[in-house]
């Protein structure tokens, strides 16, 4: 099996940092972001943008479709933004131009001068912005953020080793409200220290077993400062998330929201609201009236407990996490050569400190990105190499995007002929894309049949992005 290259998308002038398949009404498209804050929403079939805008002034670290057409971005400019992309009808379809590339639109110039003789108003006129809301966040490291069911996990405001949990939306039946009016930012858990949580968990387990021993900082066996900074965070479900750390530890956390709920009434109310997955845009996120029990929420943080720990990747930092929903496992990649598989516990009443797990030596270091579907596992490495495996980890293919270059002559004598050398391009992400459902062709005219035949989104696709600003799409 070898992937078939279908096309290459070119438009970014900077290193691509994130890509995200974007689903609307059962149709798949692609969103990409780069190191200068530019965002492009691509039509995969036409190979052209649906919309282009400058979303941030710095490197975009997280790009995530959270639900119903809303797009979340997180950047090193200390902002998280949520964009209503689907309902944006007046966006630019022009590629970013060099004169606009480095304009700092969202920051205030200290000297009051405009960058590259281009005004911010000119940039906004050329590339209008979708409706959006802004959430300030810690940008001291390169850890991503993740979202599930109105809740957001981010590195803590004051310490990148710790994390915060936010509630960012309050359900409302007023669908005509703006996105900004619906934002209800609330930090429900602040500066959660994993090391203190670990000490508390182990101490409690020791007491239950009759062992009088408490972990102290002076006996810390870790080579780094405790677990180090957060590297990757991943929600598995609404009340369960995993964080990969600089030390190589993978830790699972369970959120118990029941402690923050009190006074449940048996009478159902018809004016309560929950997201409707069948309705797109803001109306789907906030506009579905359903019956539910009236609950009074008291001002109490949810209970977060540590339920899993594994150090199989230590001492290498964890740089990639993905969830395999078919096997209910977390797949973890690090700066080393080993890919590890972690079974998610079936119940969370007991802490699982597991020293062993399934691991595979891929014989190549720097596991930058991992993606999986029902039959294929794809791993991308720092240096641009992509490997494909079946679910039993038998290697199926290798691919490396090469950039031809001419070797430098050793002398000016003219005796040595220049030789062409192959130089690999640094990889950013690999993504396996769930194909569209094949539509029945309602018309038998030639144009409709050709359009249906050329629709590549009905097949299994592999999308790889690179630091030269290109995106390559394969059929797998």
Curated annotation (Swiss-Prot):
Gene3D superfamilies: YVTN repeat-like/Quinoprotein amine dehydrogenase. WD repeats lie at residues 11-52, 55-93, 132-176, 313-352, 362-399, 441-476. Signal peptide: none annotated. It is found in: Nucleus. It comes from the Eukaryota. The keyword Lipoprotein does not apply. InterPro entries: WD40/YVTN_repeat-like_dom_sf, WD40_repeat_dom_sf, WD40_rpt. Keywords: Chromatin regulator, Nucleus, Repeat, WD repeat. SUPFAM superfamilies: WD40 repeat-like (SSF50978). Component of the ASTRA chromatin remodeling machinery complex. Component of the ASTRA complex involved in chromatin remodeling. This is ASTRA-associated protein 1. It comes from Debaryomyces hansenii (strain ATCC 36239 / CBS 767 / BCRC 21394 / JCM 1990 / NBRC 0083 / IGC 2968) (Yeast).
